[in-house]
Amino acid sequence: RRSSDLVLGAGSLTQLVTHKDEHIESPRELKGKTVTVLAYTDTTYYALLGMLSKVGLTKDDVNIQAAGPAGVWQQFASKKAVGMAGVPDWTVSSMDAGAQVDILPADVYFKSMAQAILASDDTIEKNPQLIQKLVRATLKGMKDIMADPKAATKVYVEHVPAHKGKEASILKAFEMYNQYVYAAQKVPGQMDEVRLAELQKFYVTNGVVPKEVPVKDLYTNKFVMGK
């Protein structure tokens, strides 16, 4: 079994990104159109299905293309797709390639999850100090980005020199994470059990996972709370 130790932010990692000149204001307007996702087994795909379900559409109503980590934004940027279910990094890449975009947060329609740290129950039991250090460092990074994205960009580039010269794009991505993913979490890193339970129901209903399990078996907040 695996447990999720923390979730990075109160928002969804995925947003629906469309071309500004398409004037798409609702997932309902995607009917008959092409939208890219990373893969058919990826959270971007499931988040898109969730958004469509809230407006009475299914995967059969939209031409969903699994385009891979580069193609997902490249096909969108080149206007081979009217939209993509993407993360802030891809949105910035498409904007850098010239796309003018509108961003519709998935949360407006379907509350999927943000990023999380996963660990096995065995590791949590036998090496809790490792998990605590990883959680503490990850939350510090998130808090630094939230507090001062410009300073965080500078520190990031110093530690990843391959990205030198790309500071503007990195800053833009950090600001999007702040706006759409990290914001509004009451306790940084704390799992929202109600949200997780609702997501599990959707996954079971749509055959993503075979059956429901007790939600409390899926996560622990003890490392977030420092206990």
Task: Name each model feature, range by range.
Residues 1-3:
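Short, small-residue-biased leader/transition segments that mark boundaries at the very start
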Residues 22, 71-162:
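Pocket-lining segment of extracytoplasmic ligand-binding domains
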Residues 52-56, 61, 150, 164-168, ...:
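Mature soluble domains of exported/periplasmic/lumenal proteins and thiol-rich metal-chelating peptides
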Residues 12-96, 114, 194-197:
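Bilobed "Venus flytrap"/periplasmic-binding protein-like clamshell domains
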Residues 196-227:
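Conserved C-terminal helix/tail region of periplasmic/extracytoplasmic solute-binding proteins
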Residues 6-8, 27, 107-109:
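Short secondary-structure boundary/capping segments
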Residues 126-208:
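Secondary-structure end/capping motifs
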Residues 53, 58, 100, 162-163, ...:
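Short coil/loop linkers at secondary-structure junctions
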